[in-house]
Amino acid sequence: MANMRKNHPLLKIINHSFIDLPAPSNISSWWNFGSLLGMCLVLQIATGLFLAMHYTADTTTAFSSVTHICRDVNYGWVIRYLHANGASMFFACLFLHVGRGLYYGSYMYLETWNIGVILLFTTMATAFMGYVLPWGQMSFWGATVITNLLSAIPYVGTDLVEWIWGGFSVDKATLTRFFAFHFILPFIITALVIVHLLFLHETGSSNPLGIDSDADKIPFHPYYTIKDILGVVVLLAVLSGLVLFSPDLLGDPDNYMPANPLNTPPHIKPEWYFLFAYAILRSIPNKLGGVVALAMSILILLFVPFLHTSKQRSMTFRPISQCLFWILVADLITLTWIGGQPVEHPFILIGQVASVLYFAIIIILMPLAGWLENYLMKW
């Protein structure tokens, strides 16, 4: 059996990736989120496939088809809420995974990091299109507001928006194409995940100390497979609790009203995992400036490896950088809160201060902290 595992053309790849893979002996539970994200992706594709069997991508029947899934399909409500709350768990794991990468200097593996940022972008696009599909009030107005942002692009903006809409407003054509993209993108994400793992296994995992771990490696199985199973059990327990006890906790009540182009909801807001970017968008009075800031809130991650000035890779022994990192986390939580608030005083000012601080920490303060720590260590 061992021979087959090591020699069979297909099993050999799985063996080198998940069984005999040499892994650092000291990686903590923060390294669990990669496997949890893989599990979330499989769960989303599986539940999404069953939902697609009963869903109709038509403006007149989309809302009714989702209601039909919840009421008439066997365990349809479980599948629907697993999919909706599974997306929330997916993004929670994504943000923790990116945060781990920032804290422990995983961004120094350039190719892996860049593919990861592309994955984050693609996942956000997929989730946005999925939010439009139930065709509730927030689905319709969210799609209208966010796609309309592209009209801020000089010269081609208006044409681009109408091209995406497939007409002069968000309508049947928009819903149909969003469903098509929402269905195909998870498979593109799966392909990108394979590339992400390919680049990761070229270098091997980093570790909490940020030092070379070639001298002390252990096999991935059984040590980290058991550790990953614990993470999966915890994640499934939290997800089950959400789905079975408060499935609408993270949703918006407005989405239980069918889309009405003649009635604008008092507060248009996306799902919680987009609120930080939405707050940055709203904090800039100029439309084009807001769109640029929105894009940069994620794209800035691509510049992080080039802004690394410290001679140590990880933040484990860098107290000043640690303080800045946790201020950044608090700032992102503040932005998430602001994104869900109405556009009025004092929320506008808090959002603007938090947005400036977000970019200042990453672009200015982190590199300065790295230099200062080098100086204090007499390097």
From Swiss-Prot:
Gene: MT-CYB
Cofactor note: Binds 2 heme b groups non-covalently.
Topology in the lipid bilayer: Multi-pass membrane protein
Name of the protein: Cytochrome b
Cited function: Component of the ubiquinol-cytochrome c reductase complex (complex III or cytochrome b-c1 complex) that is part of the mitochondrial respiratory chain. The b-c1 complex mediates electron transfer from ubiquinol to cytochrome c. Contributes to the generation of a proton gradient across the mitochondrial membrane that is then used for ATP synthesis.
Any one cellular-component term (Gene Ontology): mitochondrial inner membrane
Transmembrane segments: 33-53, 77-98, 113-133, 178-198, 226-246, 288-308, 320-340, 347-367
Stretches of the chain forming a coiled coil according to its record: none
Annotated localization: Mitochondrion inner membrane
Organism for this UniProt entry: Tupaia belangeri (Common tree shrew)
Gene Ontology terms, MF aspect: metal ion binding; ubiquinol-cytochrome-c reductase activity
